[in-house]
C-alpha cells in the first residue's frame, strides 16, 4: 500500500458487529475503501460503512483489499500498473464481485477509467459511495434526522469534473433538511 502497513489496513473498523456482518459476506458488491480512507481519513471509512449499513445496502468488505494501483498508472508505470490491475481483477472475479462501491475518488477514477484502458472491459460496475447513498436515500428519506441549516458544499474535483456528480451530494444534504 502507498499509505502504510498492510496489516493495519482494517484498523478503521473496530466495530465487531459491523466487521462480522460485512467481512467476507457472500454479497457480489464490494465496498472497496482504498488507501486514503483506510489509512488517512479513517472516520470517513467508518462513516461510509455505518451509512450504507443504516440504509440496508448489501455489500461485503475484504481484509486483503490492497491498493487500487492508481499511483502506478498516473506516474507512468503502466506495465507494473497492468500487473497490479490484473491481480486485483482476478481477486474480484474469484469472489464473484459484480459491483464496486468506492468512497475514494482516486479509486473511482482508477477502477472506472484506468482498468478498462489497460485491461479492456472488466465486467464490474463501479460506483462512488455518494451515488450509492443518493440512490438508497431517494426512497428512504424518513430515516434521516432533519437539520434546519444553511450549508456551503464544495465539490470534490474528481467527483464533480470527471463524474459530473454535482446534484447528488446536494440532494443528500437537502434530504437532511439543509439548504445548500
Show the residue positions of the predicted features.
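Iron-sulfur-cluster electron-transfer modules
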Residues: 1-119, 136
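Short, structured patches in soluble enzyme cores that scaffold and shape functional sites
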Residues: 33, 104, 128-130, 155
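Conserved active-site and cofactor/substrate-binding residues in soluble primary-metabolism enzymes
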Residues: 43, 83, 128-131, 164, ...
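Short, structured coil segments at secondary-structure junctions
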Residues: 55, 121-123, 176-177
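Short, catalytically relevant binding-site loops at active-site mouths
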Residues: 107-109, 132-135, 158-161
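Short, flexible loop segments at boundaries between secondary-structure elements
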Residues: 120-147
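Redox cofactor-anchoring modules in respiratory/redox and cofactor-processing assemblies
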Residues: 138-180
Amino acid at each position: 500500500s502507498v499509505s502504510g502497513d498492510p496489516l493495519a489496513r482494517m484498523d478503521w473498523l473496530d466495530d465487531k458487529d459491523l466487521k462480522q456482518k460485512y467481512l467476507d459476506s457472500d454479497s457480489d458488491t464490494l465496498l472497496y475503501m482504498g488507501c486514503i480512507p483506510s489509512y488517512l481519513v479513517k472516520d470517513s471509512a467508518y462513516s461510509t460503512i455505518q451509512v450504507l449499513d443504516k440504509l440496508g445496502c448489501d455489500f461485503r468488505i475484504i481484509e486483503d483489499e490492497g491498493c487500487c494501483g492508481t499511483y502506478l498508472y498516473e506516474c507512468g508505470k503502466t506495465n507494473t500498473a497492468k500487473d497490479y490491475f490484473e491481480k486485483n481483477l482476478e481477486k474480484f472475479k474469484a469472489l464473484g464481485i459484480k459491483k464496486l462501491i468506492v468512497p475514494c475518488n482516486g479509486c473511482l477514477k482508477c477502477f472506472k477509467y484506468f482498468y478498462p484502458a489497460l485491461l479492456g472491459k472488466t465486467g464490474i460496475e463501479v460506483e462512488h459511495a455518494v451515488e450509492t447513498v443518493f440512490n438508497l436515500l431517494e426512497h428512504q428519506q424518513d430515516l434521516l434526522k432533519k437539520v434546519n441549516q444553511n450549508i456551503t458544499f464544495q465539490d470534490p474535483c474528481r467527483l464533480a469534473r470527471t463524474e459530473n456528480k454535482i446534484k447528488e451530494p446536494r440532494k443528500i444534504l437537502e434530504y437532511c433538511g439543509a439548504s445548500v
